[in-house]
Regions:
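Hydrophobic/aromatic-rich transmembrane helices and adjacent perimembrane loops
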Residues: 187, 197-232, 236-237
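Short acidic/glycine- and proline-prone juxtamembrane loop motifs at membrane-interface regions
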Residues: 30, 36-44
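Specific aromatic-rich, kink-prone transmembrane helix
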Residues: 2, 43-60, 66, 72-74, ...
């Protein structure tokens, strides 16, 4: 993502200061917290940023190869995580409101759309064969998690992801209005607005929108490079670069798992203030959910191994878990590589061995909730 932001900054004719500023703002942000999690979000943000990059290149060159590149980027992003579709839905009205609405009358635009459909068709066919499970999943997500999302908290969280680069984003939004070279890119802030409105309406999790901001950091850095390029203002350039570094310090403390669980629990008020203790159930817990989910994986696998070792007929034994996280942890850390833990959650439901009869079942339950009594092993 950082490299893509660098390339966008170059495409916007930003100088060395703009390149360093945009890269610094991306690097020293909560964005890299996503890389600590075994989730598709890192690639998701990269695809969002790359999609904007291909659009910017197409605006500047009108070369149809960038439409094909856009199609490929969207397809990769879609196959990784469906949320990139929200970005495209936000882009459509944004483009229609600018002079680029002419794209919708071009043959190459629709050829690229067909190319996209071909690339994602295996997934669409699979969804069709399984009665479009994505909609069932979204409904389950809405009922169990998104119903607990506070829309005001969603908007407040947007300010925290790039706290050190927030001033850069503000300058970017201002530049789209007053800076003539950016006039042709006004569909970008409009797409940000429309996509955010979509997420607010559907009560999306706040991090879903994080991919909207890297491109804005590039625009803001280029505009600041222009503003600070003469007279005494050039001396403000080092200050602008230092700001993201300084403001990253409190973000590092809160957003990254650099402290042991006991110390995080001891600073409950601080983490609660920034909503870090709020879980998907809408309640505050002792630890941030992403960090809590990582704890005890090895211990869990060892406990299951102790039980599994006592089973004589392992071939006809089923280890079934409450969710894919538990199943994945057991399969990864267990000393029994054939243990094959499964779950009715996510893709694991398709990995059950239905060839052999089951005589023994080991059930692994989720005991995260504080109202569940700890009954030992």
């Amino acid at each position: 993502t950082m490299v893509t932001v660098w390339k966008i900054t170059e495409e916007l004719k930003g100088g060395l200061f703009a390149l360093i500023l945009s890269a610094t703002a991306v690097t020293f942000s909560a964005l890299f917290r996503l890389n600590t999690l075994f989730q598709p979000n890192s690639l998701d943000v990269l695809c969002w940023t790359l999609l904007y990059y291909t659009l910017i290149k197409y605006v500047n060159t009108s070369n149809r190869k960038w439409l094909w590149a856009l199609a490929a980027v969207f397809a990769i992003g879609f196959l990784n995580k469906y949320s990139i579709a929200f970005l495209v839905v936000g882009l459509v009205p944004a483009i229609l409101l600018t002079e680029h609405r002419k794209w919708f009358a071009q043959k190459n635009f629709y050829l690229a759309a067909v190319f996209t459909l071909l690339l994602i068709s295996p997934n669409l066919i699979w969804q069709y064969q399984h009665d479009f499970l994505v909609f069932k999943h979204m409904e389950e997500l809405r009922i169990t998690q998104l119903v607990n999302v506070n829309r005001l908290d969603f908007m407040k969280d947007q300010l925290l992801y790039f706290m050190g680069g927030l001033f850069i984003i503000v300058f970017a939004l201002f530049a789209f209005v007053v800076y003539p070279p950016f006039k042709k890119y006004r569909f970008i802030p409009l797409s940000t607005l429309f996509t955010l409105l979509l997420f607010v309406y559907f009560r999306a999790k706040s991090y879903y929108a994080i991919g909207l901001y890297p491109v804005l950091l590039a625009f803001g850095a280029v505009y600041l490079d222009y503003l600070l390029s003469s007279n005494w203002k050039v001396y403000l350039k080092p200050v602008a670069i230092v700001i993201p570094l300084l403001l990253f310090i409190p973000v590092l403390r809160i957003a990254f798992p650099i402290y042991p669980p006991a110390e995080i629990a001891a600073q409950r008020d601080l983490y609660q203030k920034y909503g870090m203790l709020r879980w998907e159930d809408g309640k505050d817990h002792e630890l941030p959910q992403d960090f809590a989910d990582m704890l005890g994986w090895k211990e869990l696998a060892h406990k299951v191994d102790r039980v599994y070792s006592q089973v004589k007929d392992k071939k006809h034994t089923l280890v079934i878990c409450d969710n894919y996280g538990l199943a994945g942890a057991i399969n990864y850390y267990s000393k029994y590589k054939e243990i094959g833990a499964v779950s009715f959650n996510a893709d694991y439901k398709y990995w059950f061995n239905l060839k052999d009869d089951i005589t023994t079942v080991i059930s692994v339950k989720n005991a995260h909730n504080e109202d569940i009594e700890n009954k030992g092993d």
